[in-house]
Amino acid sequence: EFNHTGELLATGDKGGRVVIFQREQESKNQVHRRGEYNVYSTFQSHEPEFDYLKSLEIEEKINKIRWLPQQNAAYFLLSTNDKTVKLWKVSERDKRPEGYNLKDEEGRLRDPATITTLRVPVLRPMDLMVEATPRRVFANAHTYHINSISVNSDYETYMSADDLRINLWNFEITNQSFNIVDIKPANMEELTEVITAAEFHPHHCNTFVYSSSKGTIRLCDMRASALCDRHTKFFEEPEDPSNRSFFSEIISSISDVKFSHSGRYIMTRDYLTVKVWDLNMENRPIETYQVHDYLRSKLCSLYENDCIFDKFECVWNGSDSVIMTGSYNNFFRMFDRNTKRDVTLEASRENSKPRAILKPRKVCVGGKRRKDEISVDSLDFSKKILHTAWHPSENIIAVAATNNLYIFQDKVN
């Protein structure tokens, strides 16, 4: 996740660590090196825990990271695992106080009887240190696994969503939250869908959307009522009966939902497609992009190896003109909304020497395979790109492929 200026890039891993990369200042003005990032700070955000009431282990794995807009010299970010959201402050220190009266240089207290002179403490320069400190811990509000966090445009509140509920928090208050959506039925046997993702509108602090495992998107307005179980708008595409199959419901489940920067459009990702919806048109998306339609014939084996339940994310570029999402075999896809052109690129160690140009990849479905094409049957489904990020104003992208992070910039002639 890039911060709002794009100077920092935060990543979370399965071990509960957050690693922040900072853009190399010297390389910014050098055209061919402008996308260089180096490690800025690493800290342990979450530890493994155990829920003794339910006899369940709580993984430390980071599910989501969201930056807050910068208000002063320090940076603030939210990170969450399955149960607990934390607010972190990341700040720099290049001076330290020296010359305390009651403490010696090691920090031990001195006997007041030995103090004969009064000193004024002074600040001395020291090597730059980046400190990460937890400022707030928002816990005990989610029975189910948290899948989304989203910072509101009022910068005072944020929401966290799990499978059945969405809670609204104030950054200053850790011991209570407002439940704004609750889709849990009185009888759990009647449960037909779960919440898969949620996000606030980028400009209107009262509006948010959430998506479901049934492929629907609900837009809610908090001005209408305190509990937003009744939506303001309901986006759903009618199903084509000719495409109906055993897997229809599974592959229509939405894994990610994102507002465009302008706030006019919503992008959703299901298993095979990315769809763009206009907020003013609820009955069908205005654009549908096939991410990997060649997998339609492979759904049976993808179901058997559980890949069909993978949750791919999607991102907009800074001007909302290009969208990006991941696929298998370390492939990721980009779709240009204006020219309707699309490209498949690969993030792998074999073909990405520093500053090497990525070649478009093609997947062939049957018949004769050209030399530069890859056959559907030889795709590696264990190598998947679920998480991607796009710099807010430049063509610099970050792609997470298993335990590698790749940063690419657009080619300059």
Swiss-Prot record:
Modified positions (Phosphothreonine) in chain numbering: 268
Alphabetical UniProt keywords: Cytoplasm, Cytoskeleton, Membrane, Phosphoprotein, Repeat, WD repeat
Residues with the Phosphoserine modification: 245
Species: Oryctolagus cuniculus
UniProt superkingdom: Eukaryota
Gene for this chain: PPP2R2B
Entry-annotated residues carrying Phosphotyrosine: 265
Entries under PROSITE patterns matching the protein: PR55_1, PR55_2, WD_REPEATS_1
Role, per record: The B regulatory subunit might modulate substrate selectivity and catalytic activity, and might also direct the localization of the catalytic enzyme to a particular subcellular compartment.
GO-annotated molecular function: protein phosphatase regulator activity
Subcellular locations according to the entry: Cytoplasm; Cytoplasm, Cytoskeleton; Membrane
Signal peptide: none
Subunit-level organization: PP2A consists of a common heterodimeric core enzyme, composed of a 36 kDa catalytic subunit (subunit C) and a 65 kDa constant regulatory subunit (PR65 or subunit A), that associates with a variety of regulatory subunits. Proteins that associate with the core dimer include three families of regulatory subunits B (the R2/B/PR55/B55, R3/B''/PR72/PR130/PR59 and R5/B'/B56 families), the 48 kDa variable regulatory subunit, viral proteins, and cell signaling molecules. Interacts with TOMM22. Interacts with IER5 (via N- and C-terminal regions).
Transmembrane segments: none
Tissues expressed in: Brain.
Keyword Secreted in record: no
GO cellular component annotations of the record: cytoplasm; cytoskeleton; membrane; protein phosphatase type 2A complex
WD repeats: 1-31, 57-98, 141-179, 190-230, 249-287, 304-345, 380-412
Protein name: Serine/threonine-protein phosphatase 2A 55 kDa regulatory subunit B beta isoform
Keyword field contains Transport: no
Entry similarity comment: Belongs to the phosphatase 2A regulatory subunit B family.
